[in-house]
From Swiss-Prot:
Its EC number is 1.14.19.6. The keyword Repressor does not apply. The histidine box domains may contain the active site and/or be involved in metal ion binding. Its main location: endoplasmic reticulum. GO terms for cellular component: endoplasmic reticulum membrane. A motif (Histidine box-2) lies at residues 141-145. This is Delta(12)-fatty-acid desaturase FAD2. InterPro entries: FA_desaturase_dom, FAS_N, Fatty_acid_desaturase. A motif (Histidine box-3) lies at residues 315-319. GO terms for biological process: unsaturated fatty acid biosynthetic process. GO terms for molecular function: acyl-CoA (9+3)-desaturase activity. A motif (Histidine box-1) lies at residues 105-109.
Amino acid sequence: MGAGGRMSVPPPPKKLESEVLKRVPHSKPPFTLGQLKKAIPPHCFQRSVLRSFSYVVYDLTVAFIFYYIATNYFHLLPQPLSYVAWPIYWALQGCVLTGVWVIAHECGHHAFSDYQLLDDIVGLVLHSCLLVPYFSWKHSHRRHHSNTASLERDEVFVPKKKSSIRWFSKYLNNPPGRLFTLTITLTLGWPLYLAFNVSGRPYDRFACHYDPYGPIYTDRERTEIYISDAGVLAVTFGLYRLAAAKGLAWVICVYGVPLLIVNAFLVMITYLQHTHPSIPHYDSSEWDWLRGALATVDRDYGILNKVFHNITDTHVAHHLFSTMPHYHAMEATKAIKPILGEYYQFDGTPFYKAMWREAKECIYVEADDGDESKGVYWYNKKF
């Protein structure tokens, strides 16, 4: 969902699964970042305050309409219908608020406007309302963009080598175990990452997004971590007061369950962008920024592509040019695809099927036996 028009690109012809899973090239590409930038129309790099705010206003208006209908009319429904109405509200509100999350993420990339302070204020407010420590995540996410697909320095969804996987992993490599793992990942994955750095880069000591003195941050970033914590605490206190006034069940139904859906979509989207049998990871002997940025996948979420402001199907372009606003990313993707060629990876597999397949196929990474490129690692599932 979004305000104003947006260029749409017809989806590419549907590939056979064997083509989708075919490994992308891992050698140094025959093009440069500068050549890719020249192929993109200059206006795609322009950020408009009014246009960016129009998406904020649109999303928040839709979210308010859903909230108003739920809180003013659902109690009038016969009980069987209310059992249907609330799950519909949770799903719709969760999707819309995921779009709000994406806009706040864009603020963290300085892609919302030409004014860094404005971007940070908008991002802080929106992310805090979704219980996200804005600056804390902004800084760790920036390092993810600087080190994508590096086994040593990437910040999140860092795959394990075969020698590092836990002993119980092979016992979870079956349908019931996979369902259990995915359920935990989608429901608890985001808060566990923020609080305990689960699935994040290993540090030499405890790492937490709420700790200003943790190893994730530098001395000059610590004040902003305090600000992020204050934002989350302020919203948490507001929710406490709401629960005291309206009841805990009201807060859970109106806010809590949609937030769980936001968190689940966030984990799913980022997991599928960086986890695929066709894309490589690199150790320090092979990694470079451009190849790392290209080790990402554009996905198709159907109508949700629009609701999520195309973060799902323009992620390759986003990793190459992260300060580009989302409303130009489709046009930019269309412009660079002919240059990227086989280095561009798109997978139109429905996201629910892709999530199951990747959980099955992408257990750990290892280098190919006999390959001269010992620093290039591919996903594997064989124990």
